[in-house]
Amino acid sequence: RPAALQNRYAGEAGGLSGAPLFAPATDILARVAGHAKQRLAVIGVGGVASGWQAYAKILVGADLVQLYTGLALHGPQLPATILAQLARLMQADGLTNLAAAKGQIPDAEKAIQHALRLSQISVTPKATA
């Protein structure tokens, strides 16, 4: 379990899913994608509940992104929400498709920070005059 996990159940045995896994799972994904070198499909998992989180997984090399806990917590509209957010994030990066984003930032921490920063400027609806 991540050392930073502050939940009262942090020491319990059993499964762990969702937000606590996002950063460590993205780091492992980046390493796997680096070793795979396009020879196999890599699936980004762990803590994805927003477009920026999915984008970070793609930036480190994910071919696919799995939704699990996020889908359970946010409901069946989550995939459509994430797709709309991904479109805005790609536009902010000057990209027209996800294939162009795949593997562009192989360092997990940098990819996470980039995706988060973009989400703060591009996903928030802009006020109209």
Regions found by a protein language model. Give the residues of each.
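Glycine/Thr-rich beta-alpha phosphate-binding loop at enzyme active sites
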Residues: 1-38, 74
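A glycine-rich, aromatic-flanked flexible loop/lid motif
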Residues: 1-9, 52-61
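Glycine- and other small-residue-rich loops at beta-strand/loop junctions that grip anionic moieties
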Residues: 17-21, 43-47, 68-71
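Extended, intrinsically disordered, low-complexity segments
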Residues: 22, 84-129
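A general structural detector for well-ordered alpha-helical segments in enzyme core domains, enriched
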Residues: 25-28, 53, 78, 82-86
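Alpha-helical structural signal in soluble globular domains
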Residues: 31, 35, 60, 81, ...
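Glycine-rich beta-to-alpha transition loops that act as phosphate-gripper elements at the mouths
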Residues: 38-52
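Glycine-rich phosphate-binding active-site loops on the catalytic face of alpha/beta enzymes
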Residues: 48, 54-81
